Curated annotation (Swiss-Prot):
Residues 1-21 form the signal peptide. Sequence repeats lie at residues 34-39, 40-45, 46-51, 58-63, 64-69, 70-75, 76-81, 82-87, 88-93, 100-105, 106-111, 112-117, 118-123, 124-129. Residues 34-129 are annotated as: 14 X 6 AA approximate tandem repeats. Small intestine > large intestine. The plasma contains the pro-SPAI form circulating. It comes from Sus scrofa. GO terms for cellular component: extracellular space. Pfam families: Cementoin (PF10511), WAP (PF00095). Disulfide bonds join C146-C175, C153-C179, C162-C174, C168-C183. The short form (AA 127-187) may be an artifact due to the strongly acidic conditions of the duodenum. The pro-SPAI form may be the native form. Keywords: Disulfide bond, Pyrrolidone carboxylic acid, Repeat, Signal. This is Sodium/potassium ATPase inhibitor SPAI-2. Residues 28-98 are annotated as: Disordered. The keyword Oxidoreductase does not apply.
Length: 187
């Protein structure tokens, strides 16, 4: 890449970064609490600061509507159907079974065995390492040597038809050909 095009990319990046920073400053409002802007500084005429409300847990916001004091967001509907939550009870923990209770009905845990570790096999095997290696196949080199190629194709990245000698049928070897690696008869 030329240095001129690199400088253009850097300049575009810096311009985009300053535009994003200006946009964030408009959204956030002035920095500090109650400070007046510095004299001589232009005020951005854009949307004012975004109003963010922190909701209590269990309160569902409805888009475009503010909750009315004294009313539930949905009339006549409890937050959890058929259950009244106790004030000290967490709704997530309320669904978990007791410590002594078995999660799977009809099955009792085996004594002295962790239920999570009981599901794992004794020896975890890698499927690639479990397969026996083919003896001598990857190191196999066919007899002879590759012929000399006088001309090369003008492509900068030619396609290869083979990678190693065993990719080629019969007595052919994988050699550098006219345009990339190809299966050729050896000398």
């Amino acid at each position: 890449m030329r240095s001129r095009s690199f400088l253009v990319l850097v300049a575009v990046f810096l311009i985009c970064e300053t535009l994003v920073a200006q946009r964030l400053d408009r959204i956030r409002g002035p920095k500090g609490q109650g400070q007046d802007p510095v004299e001589g500084q232009d005020q951005d005429e854009g949307p004012g600061p975004v109003k963010v409300e922190i909701l209590d847990i269990g309160q569902d916001p409805v888009k475009g509507q503010d909750p009315v004091k004294g009313q539930d967001p949905v009339k006549g509907q409890d937050p959890v159907k058929g259950q009244d939550l106790v004030k000290s009870q967490d709704p997530v923990k309320a669904e978990l079974p007791d410590i002594g209770q078995d999660v799977v009905k009809g099955h009792e845990p085996v004594e002295g065995q962790d239920p999570v570790n009981a599901q794992l096999p004794d020896k975890v095997q890698d499927p690639v390492k479990a397969q026996p290696a083919v003896p001598g196949r990857f190191l196999l080199s066919k007899r002879g040597h590759c012929p000399r190629i006088l001309f090369r194709c003008p492509l900068s990245n030619p396609s290869n038809k083979c990678w190693r000698d065993y990719d080629c049928p019969g007595v052919k070897k994988c050699c550098e050909g006219f345009c990339g690696k190809d299966c050729l008869y050896p000398k």
